[in-house]
Every structure is written in structure tokens, then in C-alpha cells.
């Protein structure tokens, strides 16, 4: 057994190096801390120069308030800060930094120099992180922090760094996060003296476009809502623009970039009905909340926060984003990703306007360019009709068989000539205006799967099963919420063979099945009789529907099935109760489905996240036939 070592106080340098291990992981961590200090100093222009991906050098120059020469040594002292003075100030801190550890930690693992000049001072002053000697220097008002040879003093940490290109990429990511939070600040980034990024002061909408690109903004919906002391604004992507990776998710709480499980779960809940598979939403969201209601002193790098009332935050974010996604529809779908001034291209269900919607925020210093609550976020978007047209499937229409196409070209009988002349003389039916029917009027059915329709923009193609599935799903949700799910008694019960465990489920959960609109009873030791079903699903495949419900019931149990799994069950029911492929519809039925799509929330995607319709403009069709080329 080795000799016991006495307890001793650690030297300040080692303490700072230990603290640096929590905060300074890589060059991007250094850059983040320095940029946050510049923002806290009131900078309006920040220049960043990197060498070796930030490993060899990180120099940040700002035009902020500067540091007086007598305070420069304190700036490199641990737990010295101008941000807070008491616990009360800590609990309501609004600045980016507040611990007073960043510069001391950086100086312990790298060569650090600060040159700073306050406004009105005759010249700047310089301090070296090693000697802590303050000397006169030249420089404009503001502060320059120069960090060289990161982790040279801690070789064990340096070997964990990646290539220069990788570290440079992380530095760009860190700078983008800060730039998105502070659009009023101008940023310039140089790498090996070559300009890499430049963002001029702008509003939030323009800054998002500058940083993330026009393609990102071309697929977003604006978000703006406030309730009491909490407000949310920003942009969320439409479900059709979801990504395979969660790499475009930016959440800011009081201007601070964070990763929060509460808000992330709320966003996933809002997208639950419209995301396909494992796709990830993209968003830039700014959550504004009373600083006293959120604890930012949770994570060493301040990446996490703790809300005093996380449940209220979850409900607010989920409802706001859910309502935003629900308000999308055919009337608001226009081409995405179109260069400025170019003609529109094909627009998929739910794609946005070519011009990015402006952003505004609920309170100062946010700009006021956002639409008011309840107003359409897209200028010129047609109003939606509020009359519901019931969609009911009738008998097969009496159409001309495909094998008898020759009859279309037979000569008209003599008594039909006047009628034909009158038909040719009659004016063409005017196109439906966008205000009347955003999805237009049905023209025909294609292969028993798609509906072709004509609207004021051009041609609309609808997946009739996917569209009807969404319509039925939303109707089921509303009916179950209102405890008014109508039942349809079957004239002849549907009896099918079932496993003993399914028969037992029917006996055990008869009451819960009744709540869902089903009346099922055992008709033998291995058979079940279905006597009633939800009226919305009465025309579906009753046996398949009953088996699907029992399968879900056995998999998750009745308590979860009627709470968190409720929507999954209703989605299954809607899928089995929707019009199937190869079912021939009349024009009246097709138009009824289009009208219901226009008044149904989230009608742009089916319950599984796939698009329900696509739009081709007349210009798109002209291009196909080289018209005007």
C-alpha cells in the first residue's frame, strides 16, 4: 500500500487548467467564450481571424466598450467578472457570461494577449496572460483577444483535437450560432487571412437567410406567439423539408444557444403527426422568458438550462408549433428554392413562398415585421373556405370502359348535332380563383390512385388515399376529444376468426372499445363479432380495422393506448377506413375530398408524413413542352 499523500491546496494554474477541461474542449469553445464576451461588451462589429483551424491562433477584435487598464489583470483572474454581484443577480442573469472563468481558463492552456481601449482613452493597453504585465499599445476603441498555440501546455488535451479542417468547421458552427442570436451585430471571419464569412447587420429573418441559405428559408414557416411572460418566434421547416440528421436545430433561450430536452420533446410532439419515419425537423427558434424563470447556471459551458415550470414551457412550445404546422395548406403552397426573379417551379404540398417571410419578435429589440396572430404569414395568401363539404363514397360511376375507347370517336347521331354545336359555342368554365378553391376543381382520376385537378396556378395532383387518410384522422381526433365519436351499427355483424388472446382482450376491455366507437363481442371461443364501428370508418374493411385495433391494444395496453398512444391508434384506424387505391370516384366525390383537404389541419401530409399533393404551375408545364423557349 502506497504512502498516504497529505491534503493540499491546488495551485491556481492547475485549478484554471481543471476548469478549462470543463469549458474549453476545442478551438470552437475558445471562440464561443470570446464572442460572448464581445457581445456582453456591446460590440456591433466583430472580426475573427483563425490559423490552423483555430489551433494555432484565434484572434477576435470587437468595437465594444473596452476594458480599463486597471481592470485588465482582473480580467485574467478566476471568478472576477463585471456581470453579477449577488445571488439575486445570478438568478436573473441576462448576460452571456457571468462566472468569470473563461479568460483565466484559456490563459492556462494557451498563450493569450489582450489589447483593449475604452472610448475616450488616448491609447490602448495590452496585457500578456503569462506575465500579467500591463503596457501601452496601439489600437482602436474596443478589445482584441489573441489566443495562440492552444493546448501546447497540455499535450494530453491537444492529441484529442481533430484535423485543422474539422476544427475550422466547428469554429464556423460556433460563430453561426452566435450570429443567429445577434443579427444586429456584423461579423467577419478570416482563415489564414482569407475571408470565409461576412454577415452584415440585419433583422432576424435576413440573418437566418444569410447564415443558413435561401434554400433553408425557402422551406420554413414563421412562428410568432406570446402568452404572459413567455414568447416564441423564429422559423420551423415544413414537414416535407425534414432532414435525415438533426444538424439544423437552433434553439435560443433569452438569446443564448442551448440544447434543452424539454423544448426538443415539445417540438417532436408538434411534428409527431407529420414527420415521415426518422426524419428530423429543422428550426431556428427564439424563446423569450423571464430570466428569473430559467436557470442558466446548470452546465459548465452553459449549453443547458433548467426551467422553473418546464411543463408550461413544453405545452406552450408544443401548441404554438403544432398550430403553425396545422395552418399550412394548399392555399399557401408555392414553389420553394426558386432563385429571386426566376419563374416558379413545381411546388410540393406545403412548400412556402419564394420570398422568405419576414420575421418579427414579440418585444424590443425585436423588429415588427411579423404577421399578427391569426393572420396568414404569407402576403397574398388566399383565405381558406370555412364551409365543410361532406365526403361520402357512392356507388361506382357509370363511366366508359377503357376497352371501349373507340366509341369516343364514332360519328354523333343526327339529333345530337345541335347539342354539340351549343356545347362548342358555350364559353369555357372559368378557372376557380384562389379565394374560392385553392386546390381547384377535379378533372379526372388517374390509375385509381391520383386525382387530377385544375386550380388558378395550374395542375394539382392528389394522392387520394393519403389525403383521405389525413382527413379521416383529423375528424377522429376531434370527435374523440369532444367525446362525440358517432357509431354506426352494422346491419349484419362481421364475424372473423381470432386468437384466444384477442377474444380475451375484447371481453376485458369492452368499455374502452366502446369509447372508441366499437362494439365487439366474442361469438365463440375463437371468433369475434363486430356489431358497431365508428361511423367515419363504416365503409372501410371492418375485419382489418378490428384486427389492427386489437393488435395495438395487445401491444401497448389499454391505458397507454388511450393516452400517449391514442393518436397512433387513430392513425391506424384512419388508414384502414380511408378510400383505397383503385376505387373509382365521381367528380363530385373528388371535389368533396379537395374541399375537405382545404379545411383540414395538416392536410399537406398523410398520417405517416408523406405529402398528399403536388402542384405544377402553368409555367412548369410550358417548360415540359419547350413552350416559349
From Swiss-Prot:
Q: Which GO terms describe its molecular function?
A: ATP binding; ATP hydrolysis activity; ATP-dependent DNA damage sensor activity; mismatched DNA binding
**Species for this entry:** Bordetella pertussis (strain Tohama I / ATCC BAA-589 / NCTC 13251)
Q: What job does the chain carry out?
A: This protein is involved in the repair of mismatches in DNA. It is required for dam-dependent methyl-directed DNA mismatch repair. May act as a 'molecular matchmaker', a protein that promotes the formation of a stable complex between two or more DNA-binding proteins in an ATP-dependent manner without itself being part of a final effector complex.
The family database entries (PANTHER family) matched by this protein are listed as: DNA MISMATCH REPAIR PROTEIN MLH, PMS, MUTL, DNA MISMATCH REPAIR PROTEIN MLH1
Name the PROSITE patterns on file. Answer: DNA_MISMATCH_REPAIR_1 (PS00058)
Biological-process GO terms, alphabetical:
mismatch repair
Keyword annotations for this protein, in alphabetical order, are: DNA damage, DNA repair
Which branch of life, at top level? Bacteria
Q: Where is this region: Disordered?
A: 358-397
What are its GO cellular component terms? mismatch repair complex
What protein is this chain from? DNA mismatch repair protein MutL
Q: Which InterPro entries match?
A: DNA_mismatch_repair_CS, DNA_mismatch_repair_MutL, DNA_mismatch_S5_2-like, HATPase_C_sf, MutL/Mlh/PMS, MutL/Mlh/Pms-like, MutL_C, MutL_C_dimsub
* SMART domains xrefs: DNA_mis_repair, MutL_C
Bias class Low complexity marks the residues at: 371-382
Family stated for the protein in its record? Belongs to the DNA mismatch repair MutL/HexB family.
